[in-house]
């Protein structure tokens, strides 16, 4: 089984990568913003069966290029999973009142949590259109 997991650098994505390996995945195509600096990369270093790609949901070109690279490396995909999302970071905290909302924060959250996953699936569209069974989540 060939599995792509977006957001495999830590958290849920990393847990799913470990699960995919124990469930018998033959190839993993994993993404993280900075793979070499991620916990996932330390736990699942690149091998002939584990492929890491740098991808940033705030950069549409990064998403498209990553999709192209995955499609070039993978003979086919059986699972495409996207897990990354953002609730807060150094400058962005969950809002408790409407007065705390800012256009910049809302745009960043929308880009990462809504547009990023859709653009990632779009970048893999040739694989999604194939006739073989594929699960995308």
What function would you assign to each model-found segment?
Residues 9, 15-18:
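N-terminal Rossmann NAD(P)H-binding glycine-rich loop of SDR-like oxidoreductase domains
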Residues 21, 25-40:
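Conserved glycine-rich Rossmann-like NAD(P)H-binding loop of the short-chain dehydrogenase/reductase
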Residues 45-61:
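Rossmann-fold cofactor-recognition segment
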Residues 58-73:
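Conserved Rossmann-fold cofactor-binding substructure of NAD(P)-dependent oxidoreductases
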Residues 83-94:
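Conserved NAD(P)H cofactor-binding loop of Rossmann-fold oxidoreductase domains
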Residues 99-118:
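Catalytic Tyr-X3-Lys loop
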Residues 116-121, 134:
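Conserved internal alpha-helix within the Rossmann fold of NAD(P)-dependent oxidoreductases
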Residues 120-124, 128:
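Hydrophobic positions on the long internal alpha-helix
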